Swiss-Prot record:
A lipid is attached at C33 (N-palmitoyl cysteine). This is Uncharacterized lipoprotein MPN_590. The keyword Cell membrane applies. It holds the Pfam family Mycop_pep_DUF31.
Amino acid sequence: MPITKATPLFLRYRLKGFVFLTLLLVQGVFTACAPAVPVNNKSVSAVQPEDKQALKPDPALGEYTSDLKFNTNFIPKKDDPFRPFYDLSFTLQFQDPYTATYGTGWLIDWKDNNQPNKFTAYIATNLHVADNLRNVNDYEFFNQFDYFDDPTESFTLGKFVDGNEIKQIVPDAMHEPSLVRIETSKLPKTAYTTTLFINDLGEYRLPAADFAVLESI
């Protein structure tokens, strides 16, 4: 029987109550017939499949494993063709009062300062990495950043090294390979920048073709 404006008020409430009880009864029947599903933190809609043995990278292998879908960190051996790239590559960290920005650089030249344990290193990197440097003492041509920007407080070089080599210098250090960081004695300066050193990549790729050299002591 449809509910209309002509239906008496008391009958409307009886019909609506009947519909509500019917829906509640149907829900109870379906709930009682449904299979029990264990509840966990991930989902209550289905039984979770058994976890497979997690694949863990093994740095000792020093090679790409297709099952892992990524390259693990390892140190190339002396006769590895990638060893020269490893020897010259470093992580770069620019630290301002609030944030730390990271990049990668490689040593392309150096200059003897005629001072014990000091030399000037010329580190190549991408311009968008070097752009994080805010050194008020930078060379005049490159010292044109907004002075409202947070200045760089420290510059750090890092390298993934063999734990046994570290232990020769620091006896209490761990044997495991680890990332070692060393802060330079002074903030670097910008020695060179360009975005035109590659001209045949096509217009859509030129924004990524940037290059810079940092002078660090």
